[in-house]
Amino acid sequence: MFANVDEAISWITSRTRSAHQASDFRQYVQSLGNPQLKLKCLHVAGTNGKGSTTNYLRSILQKAGYKVGSFTSPHLMTHLDRIRINDENISADYFLKIINEKQQEWESHDLTMFEIDTLISIYYFLDQQVDYAVYEVGLGGRLDPTNIIMPIGAVITNIEMDHMNILGNTIRQIAREKAGIIKDGLTFATFEKKRAAIEVFNMAAKVHKAKMIRTHQARNVKISDHIEFDYQSYHVSLPTIAPYQILNASAAIALLRALKREKKLQISKADILQGLQTSWAVRFEQVSEKPRVIIDGAHNENGIDELCHALAQIPEEKVIVFSALKDKRYRQMLEKLQGQGELIITEFASKRSTTAENLAEGLEGVTVIDDWNEAIDEALRRNKTVIITGSLYFISLVRERFLKQ
């Protein structure tokens, strides 16, 4: 028995590895009676944009008057923000209660943190009687714990080279893992364009008699202090200057329009346009005005490419603070960032992180500061726009620092 939620979180976060297979978790959930099948779910997979797309879907459904659960990772401020209903985290009391009730059972089945989080979200959403639940895939798709759900619709954002040690070394291999969320009769949207990935999606759609919707190109894009664009019959406004959000918003529109046509939900054009007025933390998020500080969770090459595209909208000089996990292609990420402004390389405490010295090896003209707080302090003294990026785990620490100020 845990006395408080901090003890419960400490226990759950210690359960990072397991010897069992994904099929063992599925069998365990079947022994519970498959409670997840009582939920109406949307599923979001892909290399980049999963969190933003999940947030757009949640916000639009919420504007339509629905009670909406969302499951995302990693957390931004507290472990509890992985599981939310509308704009509220799961209650600490419920989280503590269910872990105290189920701890021994979950330990006996050797469940991992992500499997436990998935189960808690299902129990919580059922208890609170949500109308819809939007699930973001943690990693891949086929073997991900969230793949126990039977969604009414899905988005597979894009396919890029990331997590190759787990998902495969080619676009086709990675696409197969992501396409593992495609179920019989599923309607899913994607903005992926690479031929190898689309061939995989087409094959999966044929096998499962699923319907793939490929998003259209946005038209009349204008970027000032926000973004405006036309998508089909919609004139969309987004409260960001990050162009990559156009793709995520378009995927959300495409899926929800299709589900409306299939009479799987009721939603209006106004609901969609108003729902897209939301913003997603750590995605080109400004956390300070003077000096201007922007944090972005780009954590792979494609994410950095999209960040660089967004940085082109900022004319003033920039200083970039960077850290990354050791299993990422950080050298390629840093090479892309070198032309964007002065680089300060740092490190943060994580089992998966690496030293600032390792990150900076072989690079010229960069500043190395081991302590990430000191690195940010140094960047703030430069009297330039400060950009902080490289890892979602790093950015969550940075965000907490600025929100406490």
Identify the meaning behind each predicted range:
Residues M1-G46, T53-Y66, F71:
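Short functional linear segments
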Residues Q129-E136, G153-H235, A249-K269:
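Acidic, Mg2+-coordinating active-site environments of NTP-dependent enzymes
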Residues L57, R142-I152, R399-F402:
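Short Gly/Thr/Asp-enriched flexible loops that form oxyanion-binding sites at enzyme active sites
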